[in-house]
Amino acid sequence: MIYSKEIVREWLDEVAERAKDHPEWVDVFERCYTDTLDNTVEILEDGSTFVLTGDIPAMWLRDSTAQLRPYLHVAKRDALLRQTIAGLVKRQMTLVLKDPYANSFNIEENWKGHHETDHTDLNGWIWERKYEVDSLCYPLQLAYLLWKETGETSQFDEIFVVATKEILHLWTVEQDHKNSPYRFVRDTDRKEDTLVNDGFGPDFAVTGMTWSAFRPSDDCCQYSYLIPSNMFAVVVLGYVQEIFAALNLADSQSVIADAKRLQDEIQEGIENYAYITNSKGEKIYAFEVDGLGNASIMDDPNVPSLLAAPYLGYCSVDDEVYQATRRTILSSENPYFYQGEYASGLGSSHTFYRYIWPIALSIQGLTTRDKAEKKFLLDQLVACDGGTGVMHESFHVDDPTLYSREWFSWANMMFCELVLDYLDIR
């Protein structure tokens, strides 16, 4: 059993009662909330949990965490659901040990995915091997939040310890990518799907930050130090120190020391290289930098993003640099900010021109203190569902019936998270 239907039903009724003035939200919320549990989650023979991303038959380390995070509230009551989430952490960490550079995996060693087009060190477990810093942040985040929200500790097993060490090692290696074994070339006409310089990536200088090949959108980085992902790494490295200290896990002293060193060096790199100025002369965060003086002003509509920095726990919503960055991102200075007849928000090179992402709209709502803005965004999300009653990867700002991805569970669950936030269920 994945969860207790009675407990979840009772909780859904409580949410519906609290949101009774917004029945249109409740309708979409219930559909999205139950769909992920009923149609994407599978308990495997070893007791671990596999979470399908939706209409692609694979599990992303990033997406799967975000898909189950909104269930932490009810997992306090539901022991079955707690074990399902703990099982996901176990599956994620097992897969990290299959290959820490991969972003998405198969349910078994079946060699499905991009094996015919991708030139990189593949194995049968890997759906895609695009290295993204955040892919390694998310399992650590879920393990920590599950512990803090519910008290569950079964996820902190030997595999967790070994995988955490592997993550720390990889991030250390990638502080100077010249020492890295990772290369990635795809046979494609789409430049965003492959790395330049024979798979090595663009030029860079050492900064203290950790290198990333691809963004959370699965498009390649223009410059190799992705600031939002390094912010996320700083946060989860703090989680690692807290977990190993509080629970006295194996090799805790050395793991804590390594995590602290990495955290300090990455944070120093952010402070030394991430700050730039916008067109108004305000100090803001760059999206990507290369350590050679180049930087980009934009944002990714996925998470981690600059917009999501407070959501990730990196800074306060009220931080002056964050607020200036937020204003810049949500303006025409960001080349991927689109305004249209039905909506405005963040798009991506990963999707069509003038298509914006519901995930980014949800994050916009989750990173404001303005209740009216949250309500506006929830109303907009429901109105722009293309008549389907669920969220999508992206939709056209002038015609929401034009959208990408019929079934995208991550977007569904980010909508649910914003509803819960609006109702002060945090």
What is each PLM-predicted segment?
Residues N123-K130, D134, Q155-E158, C220-S224, ...:
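Alpha-helix capping and helix-loop boundary segments enriched in small/acidic/polar residues
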Residues I7-D21, A66-A79, Y138-T153, M231-D251, ...:
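Well-ordered alpha-helical scaffold segments within catalytic/enzyme domains
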